[in-house]
Amino acid sequence: MSKSRLTVFSFVRRFLLRLMVVLAVFWGGGIALFSVAPVPFSAVMVERQVSAWLYGNFRYVAHSDWVSMDQISPWMGLAVIAAEDQKFPEHWGFDVASIEKALAHNERNENRIRGASTISQQTAKNLFLWDGRSWVRKGLEAGLTLGIETVWSKKRILTVYLNIAEFGDGVFGVEAAAQRYFHKPASKLTRSEAALLAAVLPNPLRFKVSSPSGYVRSRQAWILRQMYQLGGEPFMQQHQLD
């Protein structure tokens, strides 16, 4: 290898190491800060806003209103757990059984990819990382998930998740969603309304709360059944999530 190539390789290596240190400090500081402080915006919100500007859409505003868990209907927390991650109170950030099922499904159906992200993983991804699929992003997501599971309580993870989840075009967080679609605060959401909001979470830009498709309605009904099977509101109290 020539001297010039060695110099370039050395420069790139030093740059990447320094970048990793900077990112580790940034993300570590964010995990510590947001364990107690409200989250003003997420990486997904920034990505959506910048993308809109780049496409010349200056009317788009990624909007979110932070609310604490006691300002959110307990039905909402139960609905997203029923829909997205029923083992949320038990695991340490990863649902191994669901991951194995998703991998087996994806091997058989390459054109219909199924995910297995827990609420903790989704929170880490939405808060700190860019959208998309890559092994690098998945690796970073795993590290950040372990970080928030170590530092935050389950109640804090759920609170942040509900405040940064995307519920529609420019609608982030359950308070903004409740006001936009039901003209009420998140604390007043009914069981059915909470299930409808949770039903669009797999793809909130495709599935609409304002005009739910037959699939969304069937998913809403399934979520309501799962909420009942989990035990209703006592489930949240039992796991200290309310």
UniProtKB/Swiss-Prot annotation:
Keywords: Cell inner membrane, Cell membrane, Cell shape, Cell wall biogenesis/degradation, Glycosyltransferase, Membrane, Peptidoglycan synthesis, Transferase, Transmembrane, Transmembrane helix. Its EC number is 2.4.99.28. GO terms for biological process: cell wall organization; peptidoglycan biosynthetic process; regulation of cell shape. It is found in: Cell inner membrane. SUPFAM superfamilies: Lysozyme-like (SSF53955). Disulfide bonds: none annotated. Pathway: Cell wall biogenesis; peptidoglycan biosynthesis. InterPro entries: Glyco_trans_51, Lysozyme-like_dom_sf, PBP_transglycosylase, Pep_trsgly. One of its GO terms (cellular component) is plasma membrane. One of its GO terms (molecular function) is peptidoglycan glycosyltransferase activity. It is a single-pass membrane protein. It comes from the Bacteria. It catalyses: [GlcNAc-(1->4)-Mur2Ac(oyl-L-Ala-gamma-D-Glu-L-Lys-D-Ala-D-Ala)](n)-di-trans,octa-cis-undecaprenyl diphosphate + beta-D-GlcNAc-(1->4)-Mur2Ac(oyl-L-Ala-gamma-D-Glu-L-Lys-D-Ala-D-Ala)-di-trans,octa-cis-undecaprenyl diphosphate = [GlcNAc-(1->4)-Mur2Ac(oyl-L-Ala-gamma-D-Glu-L-Lys-D-Ala-D-Ala)](n+1)-di-trans,octa-cis-undecaprenyl diphosphate + di-trans,octa-cis-undecaprenyl diphosphate + H(+). The chain crosses the membrane at residues 19-39. Belongs to the glycosyltransferase 51 family. This is Biosynthetic peptidoglycan transglycosylase.
